């Protein structure tokens, strides 16, 4: 009998009434590769007072309204006075800050994401914290941004919830 990882996981989940909810890959910076990448827009470092009014849908990967108290530092890309990209980091634990990134759709494919991600990683390291980057396994564009920004795969994670909750979430999608 062929006992693949997926088959073993499925049996274990069925027996426990739990199911996989989310699978993600986490990245750490490669200090031999990490460098501030350029882009054609002005980059500005932002502290909590600067981004207090930015908890909007377009910045939901960079900032988390439900966990505002963890959002520590951001780097924004500006086209004149218009914010066109935002990378934010949250203090998910004492020593590690997680980076999230958003760019307005009409400004994508201009190197903004990698410029913001790399700059925020450098700023995080300068504060004595370890930056990390996380994305869903299916988010290939985000994983490519991590690699381009100087990060390398470090670990994977899986969130497990009661099967009825996962079924309900899947019905909504």
Segment roles from a protein language model:
Residues 1-51:
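Acyl-donor-binding surface of acyltransferase catalytic domains
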Residues 42-69:
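Internal catalytic-core helix/loop-beta-alpha segment
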Residues 64-96, 100-104:
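A conserved beta-strand-loop-helix scaffold within acyl/acetyltransferase catalytic domains
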Residues 86, 154-156:
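Residue-level detector of high-confidence beta-strand sites
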Residues 109-123, 144, 148:
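Conserved acetyl-CoA-binding loop-helix of GNAT-fold acetyltransferases
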Residues 124-136:
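Conserved GNAT acetyl-CoA-binding A-motif
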Residues 133-147, 152, 159-165:
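Conserved beta-strand-loop-alpha-helix junction that forms the acyl-donor binding cleft
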Residues 169-170:
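C-terminal helical cap(s) of enzyme catalytic domains, especially alpha/beta-barrels
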């Amino acid at each position: 009998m062929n006992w693949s990882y997926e088959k073993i996981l499925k049996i274990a989940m069925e027996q426990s009434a739990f199911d996989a909810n989310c699978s993600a890959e986490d990245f750490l910076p490669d200090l031999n590769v990490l460098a501030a990448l350029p882009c054609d827009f002005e980059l500005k470092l932002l502290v909590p007072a600067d981004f207090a009014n930015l908890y909007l849908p377009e910045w939901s990967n960079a900032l988390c309204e439900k966990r505002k108290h963890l959002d520590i530092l951001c780097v924004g890309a500006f086209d004149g006075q218009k914010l066109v990209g935002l990378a934010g980091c949250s203090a998910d634990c004492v020593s590690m800050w997680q980076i999230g990134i958003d760019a307005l759709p009409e400004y994508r494919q201009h190197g903004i994401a990698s410029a913001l991600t790399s700059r925020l990683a450098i700023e995080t390291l300068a504060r004595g914290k370890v930056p990390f980057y996380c994305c869903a396994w299916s988010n290939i564009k985000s994983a490519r941004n991590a690699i381009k920004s100087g990060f390398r795969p470090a670990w994977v994670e899986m969130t497990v919830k009661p099967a009825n909750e996962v079924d309900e979430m899947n019905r909504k999608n």
